[in-house]
Amino acid sequence: MFSLKALLAKPFASYIIRKEKKWIDNPIETQEQVFQELISQASSTAFGADHDFISINHHADFVKRVPIRDYEELKPYVERVVAGEPDVLWTGKPLYFAKTSGTTSGAKYIPLTKESMPTHVTAARNAILSYIHETGNSQFVAGKMIFLQGSPVLHEQNGIQLGRLSGIVAHFVPEYLQKNRMPSWETNCIEDWETKVEAIVKETLPENMTVISGIPSWVQMYFEKIQQKTGQKVGDVFKNFNLFIFGGVNYEPYRAKFENLIGRKVDSIELYPASEGFFAYQDKQDEKGMLLLLNAGIFYEFIPADAFFDAHPTRLTLKDVKIGVNYVMIISTNAGLWAYNVGDTVMFTSTKPYRVIVSGRIKHFISAFGEHVIGKEVEQALKEAIEGTNFQISEFTVAPQITPESGLPYHEWFIEFENDVADVSQLAAKIDAALQNQNSYYFDLIKGRVLQPLKITMITKNGFQDYMKSIGKLGGQNKLPRLSNDRKIADKIYNLNLIK
């Protein structure tokens, strides 16, 4: 079917990509310009005064004056912003706070300013235009697109609105996409995930769906519901579905499952968005890496991951990075985050242009389903669960079980008990409740029936010692990781027959 929108998309894509090429071809100059603008604009803020921004001329000055901080370390400043104080981290007050699940100390409030907010929308748009420009495929813009996201309902605190990032972004969808966009506003506002998916399936089944977007674990559930309802592969139900857009977690563990659910291959675009900024998107179908966005009000620094915990690690700028090295990514942004450690590690796959893959987290974590569970959270959950019981725990580690033989995926807890234990079902339920209480993403995944509650697998006496010995890491400074985002340790434990 002829579509004017599809016809116009190609010249528009061509125009935007020509504009983008200017900074892509001048990466170092672009980053230097961003750096100077950020320092200049924030020199009159409380943070700028505390760190003598007025005398910062070069990156070396910045390194001397501004230490690396994570959210907890930046929190005293953020709390002042949340309380309604202007000119703290950035000029004026933020437009929004993206509220995200934090560590055990509660929710994180990430500011979004009038300067930073548009970049979240522009980057997503440009990812799609880049795909159109590269492939010549534009017919999909005439069909319906679904973005599986958080509720767009916002709350107010001290005159500033707050919500989930995906919910905030929903308010900024360009006019020309509004008619094509699904689900409806009413459905998007449903808080309960299972009810929401049912409503989305009902709304989308009769439509000409061409683009489906979201975190793979959520999309998988949507696809499975469609298959249950129709008895058909998703690619047969939606014959014109040809583009899957995703971000948030590693897609590789899902790829085979998705190809099976869809029944055929579809093109995909990987995005690298976060509340702290939209960092990169896949700009070439045959390239694994994502184009690092250098003109979006974010100044990047990179620290080799193996030196990150040194007393004074070297903070590299873009010109000094090398392909294939694991770096901790540090950002300074026009939302007022300064030398901020997002917690991600990246690896460059190319320097002409600069492309990255997300290689992991600087701390051990599990986020196979987008849950962002960190070591501190599992330790705290276990501590709360065994309080007042007779359980004595010698050692434990946690891994995701993405493809169980039956039922939903889950977190598998491998625990070695000091004492004799018969039944661990109640302990598992207690740990699960404590973890849900600490981590809102995990809570959503359990309540939305994307995950089933965790399961405990008991380990033989001294089993973990045997495991450490088998990998040549028994004793000394070697620690068993509390959790991993893959099943390397889990598989080895099974292979060594260390299950009780």
Regions of interest found by a model, annotated:
Residues 131-175:
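Conserved AMP-binding loop of ANL adenylate-forming enzymes
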Residues 1-54, 62-66, 77, 83-84, ...:
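Active-site glycine/GP-rich loop and adjacent strand/helix microenvironment
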Residues 117, 121-128, 162, 375, ...:
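Amphipathic alpha-helical segments in well-structured domains
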Residues 111, 115-123, 244-245, 268, ...:
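Long, hydrophobic, well-ordered secondary-structure blocks that form the structural core
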Residues 29, 33-97, 109-115, 119, ...:
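Active-site diphosphate/adenylate-binding microenvironment
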Residues 106-111, 364-368:
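Short small-residue beta-strand/loop micro-motif enriched in glycine and branched aliphatics
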Residues 109, 145-147, 268, 456:
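Conserved beta-strand scaffold positions in the cores of enzyme catalytic domains, especially
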Residues 97-110, 456:
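Conserved adenylation A10 loop of the ANL superfamily
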